[in-house]
């Protein structure tokens, strides 16, 4: 899901090389080359990361399962969910832990300053660049957007690493025997904290993904 900051320069350079590899291509062909390069580099960005925390590794595998990304984004945009907190609650459910509303409110209080200062502003800029405003040539604007996205994902990785440390230093919630019970309990409590109810189709997608084997992470 992310690039390390040290990898950003190499990532951007290899992206440029991919585009320049189109040689003397005309504008429409350059657009096709850019689209292909974006797809390739999105896949690389999902794996070109250090192994990180157990939570981060869970997130990498879980988020790539079918329908999960779309469900998370819908919950984010429609219900005000912090996707990293949502993933944290599902990761805790895998360990059989059910968090209370107070636990989730405490987590929200701890992570909100970082999220509001970094993740949300970067997301706003990234989304504003698709499609990019005029003035700057489209290839340059798209490369800039990709660099913003890499930085946004790095901000999310740092948030997750901090959340993992919080969970290890002071475990949250109570233990139950069923992953589904824990997941449903955590989602229900988070919905109450958000003062909403999560749509059942999104819940079903997330629960189904929890019951699927985690995709093998590339070394």
Describe each model-derived feature in a short phrase.
Residues 1-11:
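Extreme N-terminal basic, low-complexity initiation segments
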Residues 2, 14, 35-36:
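Low-acidity, Ser/Thr- and Arg-rich intrinsically disordered low-complexity segments
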Residues 14, 84-94, 150, 164-165, ...:
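Short, hydrophobic/amphipathic alpha-helical patches that form generic packing surfaces
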Residues 15, 55-76:
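Short amphipathic alpha-helical segments and their helix-coil junctions
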Residues 54-60, 66, 205, 209-218:
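Acidic, glycine/proline-rich low-complexity segments that act as flexible tails and inter-domain linkers
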Residues 69-112:
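N-terminal interaction modules that seed assembly of large macromolecular complexes
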Residues 129-209:
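A charged, amphipathic interaction segment
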């Amino acid at each position: 899901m992310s690039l390390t900051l040290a990898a950003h320069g190499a990532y951007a350079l290899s992206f440029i090389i991919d585009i320049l590899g189109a040689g003397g291509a005309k504008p429409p062909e350059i657009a096709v080359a850019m689209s292909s390069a974006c797809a390739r580099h999105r896949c690389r960005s999902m794996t070109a990361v250090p192994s990180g925390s157990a939570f981060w590794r869970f997130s990498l595998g879980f988020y790539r399962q079918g329908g999960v990304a779309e469900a998370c984004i819908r919950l984010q945009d429609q219900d005000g969910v912090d996707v990293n907190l949502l993933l944290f609650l599902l990761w805790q459910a895998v360990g059989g832990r059910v968090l209370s509303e107070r636990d989730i409110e405490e987590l929200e209080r701890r992570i909100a300053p970082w999220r509001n200062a970094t993740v949300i502003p970067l997301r706003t800029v990234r989304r504003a660049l698709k499609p990019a405003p005029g003035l700057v040539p489209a290839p340059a604007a798209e490369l800039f957007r990709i660099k913003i996205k890499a930085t946004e994902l790095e901000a999310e990785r740092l948030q997750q690493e901090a959340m993992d440390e919080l969970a290890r230093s002071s475990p949250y919630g109570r233990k139950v025997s069923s992953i589904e019970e824990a997941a449903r309990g955590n989602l229900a409590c988070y919905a109450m904290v958000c003062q909403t109810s999560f749509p059942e189709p999104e819940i079903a997608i997330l629960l189904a993904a929890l019951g699927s084997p985690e995709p093998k992470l590339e070394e």
